[in-house]
Amino acid sequence: MATQISTRGSQCTIGQEEYSLYSSLSEDELVQMAIEQSLADKTRGPTTAEATASACTNRQPAHFYPWTRSTAPPESSPARAPMGLFQGVMQKYSSSLFKTSQLAPADPLIKAIKDGDEEALKTMIKEGKNLAEPNKEGWLPLHEAAYYGQVGCLKVLQRAYPGTIDQRTLQEETAVYLATCRGHLDCLLSLLQAGAEPDISNKSRETPLYKACERKNAEAVKILVQHNADTNHRCNRGWTALHESVSRNDLEVMQILVSGGAKVESKNAYGITPLFVAAQSGQLEALRFLAKYGADINTQASDNASALYEACKNEHEEVVEFLLSQGADANKTNKDGLLPLHIASKKGNYRIVQMLLPVTSRTRIRRSGVSPLHLAAERNHDEVLEALLSARFDVNTPLAPERARLYEDRRSSALYFAVVNNNVYATELLLQHGADPNRDVISPLLVAIRHGCLRTMQLLLDHGANIDAYIATHPTAFPATIMFAMKCLSLLKFLMDLGCDGEPCFSCLYGNGPHPPAPQPSSRFNDAPAADKEPSVVQFCEFVSAPEVSRWAGPIIDVLLDYVGNVQLCSRLKEHIDSFEDWAVIKEKAEPPRPLAHLCRLRVRKAIGKYRIKLLDTLPLPGRLIRYLKYENTQ
């Protein structure tokens, strides 16, 4: 039979389970469900039966106590609830998992307070029982009465022990604090009328007024303010009650606080005012209220971030619009020198960017060392990129050196960001607006080659990218474009067709003489050069000797020979060719003199120039000759 717990005016049942729901389950399934239930109960805390019993005894609805940080009283040992189905199953199969201990009966004093039994309390007092003695958690019966909302019991204890009205628990919580947290207004009013201090805070320096604002309890706030609660008290984070009510957009509570003397310009430990909180959290109505009462629209936190900056950062469009309409300064920078337009571009909010463009100083942007174009391109915000370019932002503005150093490749242009992201549309957009593809330490063309994106390569070359790009920090005797394309012969041929210079690949310092041992690739090609040592120039033959490239040495040399005249293979290259008998034809191909037609083709292409190779089709020559010049027919 289920255990019944009766209270005045209501009756609740606990421990009663619908066993028919589980009649169709096998024993294994029941065991599995029991394990899951036990884990859930352990995570949740008290059992369902205990929670139900508590709710019935308190005569409170299930939704009464929704707050995550509310103070809970120390639980006296409750009566043992009957064993449910899951516990029974688990005890049957594993007595070692569940050892149900006999719990002590409930404390009569606590039971009397929970039940609101004033006569029982009076009887205990008459019998000489000391009801002003705290338990191990520092709780008095007065605290229990305030927590459970038993105003009759509270008054009995107040009259019997008036000196305990402001006594604190070990968590430094007073009866006023507990009554406020639980929303028991009659208890709160009774305590304040009896002379309780309204401003005693807990260990976190949170006062009853602060907790009332946290719970959005306007009546409790009104009662506390009427009894002279300090409206400007700060918690350990420096927050006031007004900060808390603003964060919850509670206009009614805000009005009570401001009318009660709350300062609209009070700052927390980080220099944040209530208006800053409203802008940061997107509370437009609270923002309007504070502006009406004279709060500073241009308030800044300790890191110099303005309210407008935070609103842009969190993409609160209506808040940004309101702040700008009230004259907010869009040219205040944070500690990193960034403006609201920077963060809006980084977030990719087109509407906010459009609002900020007319009111943002280009001089301030230049001083910041980073253009909004960089941030939009870095995050692939193409729509914002279009808006900035339409507003005539300089597409070639470089990152400041101190900002470029934050990137390992020392990138500086918005174009580089677009190419790194493999964003073909943004790359084309920037190039159409005049982006210079040759401004970065590492050419964007090399990045495009590494990605293998022919469309991006073609765009960069069409807009003047140097096809013979080198890397200053890792010097080579031959173009880095060839080095990056070596592992893909079709890509290498594509670049050579467009005019890449292959001659330096065969200009070896050692010629037919002995070559020094090749250094390890990890120390030569991948590591950054030492600061106190000038990096040595890597020869082509040295690079193709790397283990990851050497197996392709023959085909690579074969492709390059189609784009050079009479050259001399060094001893190292000959060694590679001789290492595989099928490559013997490559050695024969390199022997001078090269065919006259081939030499003439090279002479014509050189006269045209690598930047005009794409104009070969316009020459007044036979189609067959044009194809030969373009290497479309190499026979």
Curated annotation (Swiss-Prot):
Annotated ANK repeat ranges: 104-133, 137-167, 171-200, 204-233, 237-266, 270-299, 303-332, 336-365, 368-397, 410-439, 440-469, 476-504
A single cellular component GO annotation: Z disc
Effect of L596P: No interaction with Elongin BC complex
Modified positions (Phosphoserine) in chain numbering: S371
Residue ranges of every copy of the SOCS box domain listed in the record: 586-635
An MF annotation (GO) of this entry: cullin family protein binding
Pathway it works in: Protein modification; protein ubiquitination
BP term (GO), one: ubiquitin-dependent protein catabolic process
InterPro entries: Ankyrin_rpt, Ankyrin_rpt-contain_sf, ASB2_SOCS, SOCS_box, SOCS_box-like_dom_sf
Pfam family for this entry, one: Ank_4
Key words, A-Z: ANK repeat, Cytoplasm, Cytoskeleton, Phosphoprotein, Repeat, Ubl conjugation, Ubl conjugation pathway
Location in the cell: Cytoplasm, Cytoskeleton, Stress fiber
UniProt keyword Ubl conjugation, yes or no: yes
Purpose: Substrate-recognition component of a SCF-like ECS (Elongin-Cullin-SOCS-box protein) E3 ubiquitin-protein ligase complex which mediates the ubiquitination and subsequent proteasomal degradation of target proteins. Mediates Notch-induced ubiquitination and degradation of substrates including TCF3/E2A and JAK2. Required during embryonic heart development for complete heart looping. Required for cardiomyocyte differentiation. Specifically promotes the ubiquitination of SMAD9 and targets it for proteasomal degradation, leading to avoid excessive accumulation of SMAD9.
Known partners and oligomeric status: Component of a probable ECS E3 ubiquitin-protein ligase complex which contains CUL5, either RBX1 or RNF7/RBX2, Elongin BC complex (ELOB and ELOC) and ASB2. Interacts with SKP2. Through its interaction with SKP2, likely to bridge the formation of dimeric E3-ubiquitin-protein ligase complexes composed of an ECS complex and an SCF(SKP2) complex. Interacts with JAK2; the interaction targets JAK2 for Notch-mediated proteasomal degradation. Interacts with TCF3/E2A; the interaction is mediated by SKP2 and targets TCF3 for Notch-mediated proteasomal degradation.
Family membership noted in the UniProt record: Belongs to the ankyrin SOCS box (ASB) family.
Domain notes from UniProt: The SOCS box domain mediates the interaction with the Elongin BC complex, an adapter module in different E3 ubiquitin-protein ligase complexes.
PANTHER family attached to this UniProt entry: ANKYRIN REPEAT AND PROTEIN KINASE DOMAIN-CONTAINING PROTEIN, ANKYRIN REPEAT-CONTAINING PROTEIN-RELATED
Name the UniProt record assigns to this protein: Ankyrin repeat and SOCS box protein 2
Species this protein is from: Homo sapiens
